[in-house]
Design a protein with these regions (language model features):
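Conserved core of the PLP fold type I
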Residues: 1-84, 95-116
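Conserved PLP-binding catalytic core of the aspartate aminotransferase-like
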Residues: 209-211
Length: 211
């Protein structure tokens, strides 16, 4: 397809934009609101068959920290793109990166897409890179059975197989979702005081300056 386009909520993650630009897509910026991307614009652009997908970080979106609302996520699930191969690239990198228990939980887009008759609309992925080892964690992808067949078809040429020892290390260390949650609380205990110190210094030095 000539003149392929990809939707890029902006501001957003530069690596996402670089990937699609490298593969020859025209990048279309989508404005971000307090509850997520401008869905009127997303729906309008999705009516163009040359638009092939959209990048999304639904929780703590780079760099603003926005969390997509339930309403926005449900509109994503209900999309009827003109291109049959349109895909939502749902980068749920920060799905468990919460400092406290009051953080809103976002709906399961994959389940919503299936319920809406759009099972193949989304690729959801994440990793432990910001939980265990930056650049050396393990990754995960969730998608429909048909999409997983496609993904495996590409991966078998990209790699012989995953680092199974690294997978074993992670499985033995974290054990389950409770283990992951406990690790994130340890991160929070280290990071929260640092953020509070920075915020305090900024307020002390800059309040009233008009900056």
């Amino acid at each position: 397809v000539e003149h392929r386009k990809f939707l890029c909520p902006a501001p957003g993650y530069d690596r996402h934009f670089a990937i699609t630009e490298h593969f020859g897509f025209e990048l279309i910026p989508i404005a971000m609101h307090d509850d997520g991307p401008d869905m009127d614009a997303v729906e309008a652009y999705a009516a163009d068959p040359t638009v092939k997908g959209i990048w999304c970080v639904p929780k703590y979106q780079n760099p603003t920290g926005i969390i997509f609302s339930d309403a926005v996520i449900r509109r994503f699930a209900a999309l009827r793109p003109a291109a049959e191969d349109f895909r939502i690239f749902w980068d749920n990198a920060y799905c468990i990166h919460d400092f406290d228990a009051d953080t809103p939980k976002i709906p399961d887009l994959l389940a919503l897409c299936e319920a809406a008759g759009n099972p193949d609309l989304v690729y959801e992925f994440c990793s432990t890179s910001k939980i265990s080892f930056p650049g050396a964690g393990i990754s995960a992808v969730a998608a429909s059975p048909a999409n997983l067949i496609d993904i495996k078809g590409f991966l078998k040429f990209a790699t012989i197989g995953p680092d199974k020892l690294n997978q074993l290390r992670h499985a033995r260390f974290f054990k389950n979702s409770a283990g992951l949650a406990a690790q994130m609380q340890k991160h929070a205990a280290l990071l929260c005081p640092k953020f509070e110190a920075v915020y305090g210094a900024l307020h002390e030095e800059l309040d009233g300056t008009g900056v």
